[in-house]
Structure formats: C-alpha cells, structure tokens
Amino acid sequence: MRIRTAFAVGFLGLAAWSALRAQKPFKEWPAIEYADFPVPPDYQDKHEWTRARLRYPDIYGYPGRIMFLDDGRPFPGYWTMDYPRSDRHLLEGVRRLTRIDTKSVEQVVTLDESEEVFNWPVLYGVEVGHWNLGDFEAKQLREYLLRGGFFMCDDFHGTEPYHGVREWDTFTRSMSKVFPDREIEDIPDNDPIFHTIYDLQERFQVPGAVYFESGLTYEAGETGKVPHWRCIRDDKGRIMVAICHNMDLGDAWEHSDEPRYLEKWASLAYRIAMNYFTYDLSH
C-alpha cells in the first residue's frame, strides 16, 4: 500500500507522497475546448507535487461510445472541460502563491487496474454532473480517499433538469457508490479548510464563461443561484471530498487572464484552491 510520507516544508508543514518520486510520464489528451495548447518548456522537470485530473466515464457512453464534436473531432469526454488551459493557469498560481514544489503541467488519471491514482495526492473532477462511475471505479476511488487522497469536484449546477440532466442527482448517484454509508454535508464557515492560508469566511458565487454571453453568474435556473461548499469526511473528520456545487472554479482559472472575467471571481477561485490544497497536504 502506498501511503503518505510526512515532512515539513517551510511554514506550511506540508506532506508529500513518496510515490511522487517515481512520477508517471506526462501525457496529453484530446480536449473539448482546445485542440492544440502549448506545453510549458519545463513540463518534464521533476517536482514533488501536481494536481491530477480525473478521466471518468460519462452518462453519454464515453469512452466506449464514439461521438463527434461540431468540428468533426471525436468527443473526448466531459472530463476534459477547460483542460488543459485551466490546469496550467492554476498550477502557475500554486507556484506564485504557495511554497508547494509543483510541476507546470497536470496529470490525467484513470481509475483502472494500473492503480496510477495512488501516485497523486490531489484529484480534480470537472462536470461531475455527467460522470457515471462503475463499481470498479467507485471502489478504487473509495480506497484512494480512505488511504489519504483528496478529491475536489467542480462545475455542476442545480437540482432540476438542466439541458436534460439533473446534475446533482447524477453526481450523487455515482458518489453513493463510492461512499454508500457517508453523508454529504455543508462545510461550516469556521472549518480549517477555509482558513489554511486565506481567511475565506465570506465567499460568493464564482461563475463560468456563461457570464460572457448571458451576464448571469449562475446556471440551471433558480436552483443554480446559491453556491454550495460541501464535503464528505473520513472517520477522523478530515475532508476527503470537497464539493463545489453551483460554481465554476475551473472556468475562473481558465479565464483568469481574460479582461472580461472579473478579478474578484478569479481571485476567490485561486484562494479556494490554495486553501484546499494546503489543507489536504497538512491534514
């Protein structure tokens, strides 16, 4: 079993996984929004940490069913939303705002027999209102989390049908396979996760790129208006799953260099991520 190896790093007192010393090779995947995004020149450099992105099967049949985008490219799965621009902008922020020794590129991870997920301490899932975990994937994700892993999920909206999908119900259907015996709860404002680096007692909705077209900060109608910071905890009270519902942090990181996207939204999205990452590495 791979487990964490704790050590102090400056004032943060972070922890790293010994498995990172034998990091898996970096690989790029086709994406919905970006057909060709530049790779940083230092992408092969060795570092202690990076954030992994979950490649999951979805309700439309990916990866088994072949579908096509409007431009004729094969549909690469909802898991690629905002990828890789969002990931690399975020990792630049980790380098600037923390002392975490991070790579400049993300790591895409699949829940499969390779057990690669156990090499990466932080896992991110986007558009989880469309995922569809099988029994094997749910079991491996559960084991990953109970061993000390941290899963942050983002960019799903509302409780009523949105483009024909009840995203909250779809999310919880798969999550209940992962943890049938654990409840989803709201994170209180005084929880340590909101105060590891930045004090984030006061928070607001972080909108996605839909704002550029609609001028709205929410999606999915009335039930998408209120942002929810929720979680699932382990037996010791540690947050294992951080659930960002009715917000789109991924778009905030992705468009943080876009003048039309308000600085206050991008700033909060980065601060939430920095707090969540340092919480995980110190708990």
Annotated model-derived regions:
Residues 9-21:
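Hydrophobic h-region of N-terminal signal peptides that target proteins for export
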Residues 51, 117, 122-168:
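Short alpha-beta junction capping motif
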Residues 149, 176-180, 277, 281:
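Hydrophobic/aromatic-lined pockets within catalytic cores
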